Amino acid sequence: MKMINSIFTHGSLIILLLLFHSISIKAQEVDDEREFDYLEGSELGPEKWGELRPEWGTCKRGKMQSPIDISNPVQVTSKELLQTKYKAQNAIINNRGHDIMVRWEGDAGSILINEREFDLLQAHWHAPSEHAINGTRYAMELHMLHRSTDPKLTPTMVVVAVFYEIGDVDPFLSRLGPIMSSLIDQTNEHKQAGVINPMEIQLDDECYYKYIGSLTTPSCTEGVTWIINKRINTVSSDQVKLLREAVHDHAKNNARPLQALNHREVQLHCHKDRKD
């Protein structure tokens, strides 16, 4: 009987050890699912992005990288600036682990720049802001990614960016808040958001910064036209907190470090009647 009890105890110990090992491996697999992070000094951090995959080499070697510190822009006045032709369309909200993204499932409209059309694909947020103005970073930055309707022409991508400082709630985020709350820590999960009108995002198309840069996440593809609103919108601290809670710990501050300007020109485009 003692032998049976001994065998049973020994067997139980082995089972527990195997179970613990299995859980440990599973936890390791979850951690390894992320391909990059924003943690300074991490093996997957921004300074290592260009070494993680061959196709991400531009993150390290590129000379036209984003984000940048915007200072001393060249003033440009014009009668015709950015034109928005957005329209309401069904969308989904996706927790990508490193950010929260709204992706429109159909034709959500486009923007016109120099008589060229770029379709709106998705929008996502970074906190704090990725770009800076004279060394100042803001509480949050929204990116709206657009792709050219003619892929044979360059640039093929345009990102419209909006800065936010802490203040009144942002109406667009308020509408999406309940869905975002349901996606907290639900990496790679998405939910239908119904019909979302991009016009609800308060853009300033009469005064904006413009320069040529890159995507701010791997693969850091260059040749991206950046349109950054000069006007600063507001967002509540609770809304920023929600965006940070929804993603993994490694992405609560999901802003890439500032990149070298490398003699690129930054322009400030304002309508001829604009006074600011």
UniProtKB/Swiss-Prot annotation:
Q: Where along the chain is Zn(2+) bound? A: H124, H126, H143
Tissue expression remark: Confined to nectaries.
Q: Where is this region: Substrate binding?
A: 216-217
Record-linked InterPro entries:
Alpha_CA_prokaryot-like, CA_dom, CA_dom_sf, Carbonic_anhydrase_a-class, Carbonic_anhydrase_a-class_CS
* EC code: 4.2.1.1
Is Metal-binding among this UniProt entry's keywords? Answer: yes
Q: Which PROSITE patterns match?
A: ALPHA_CA_1, ALPHA_CA_2
Disulfide bond residue pairs: C59-C220
Q: Quaternary state and partners of this protein?
A: Homodimer.
Protein role: Involved in the production of blood-red nectar containing the alkaloid nesocodin and that serves as a visual attractant for pollinator visitation, including vertebrates such as Phelsuma geckos. The nectar is initially acidic and pale yellow, but slowly becomes alkaline before turning into red within 24 hours. Together with NEC2 and NEC3, facilitates the condensation of sinapaldehyde ((E)-3,5-dimethoxy-4-hydroxycinnamaldehyde) and proline to form nesocodin, a pigment with a stable imine bond.
Specify the protein name.
Carbonic anhydrase Nec1
